[in-house]
Amino acid sequence: MPIIKVRENEPFDVALRRFKRSCEKAGILAEIRRREFYEKPTTERKRAKASAVKRLAKKLTRENARRIRMY
């Protein structure tokens, strides 16, 4: 759980923004969304594998584009 200390004379908006940023860095909202509903282990593995394939395709596309620009 991200904890921030509110500084003296610090506006509430600024403290809230710092808290939101620290929550985003910790990945709390993503974790809450992921755990909102039960996901069967097979479905979880399937989703993880699909995202890995997507990441690899994206990486290869970027590398391919970089090679094309070099010539």
Swiss-Prot record:
Keywords assigned: Ribonucleoprotein, Ribosomal protein
Cellular component, GO annotation: ribonucleoprotein complex; ribosome
GO biological process: translation
Superkingdom of origin: Bacteria
Protein's UniProt keywords contain Ribosomal protein: yes
Record GO terms (molecular function): structural constituent of ribosome
Family note: Belongs to the bacterial ribosomal protein bS21 family.
HAMAP family listed in its UniProt record: Ribosomal_bS21 (MF_00358)
Name assigned to this protein: Small ribosomal subunit protein bS21
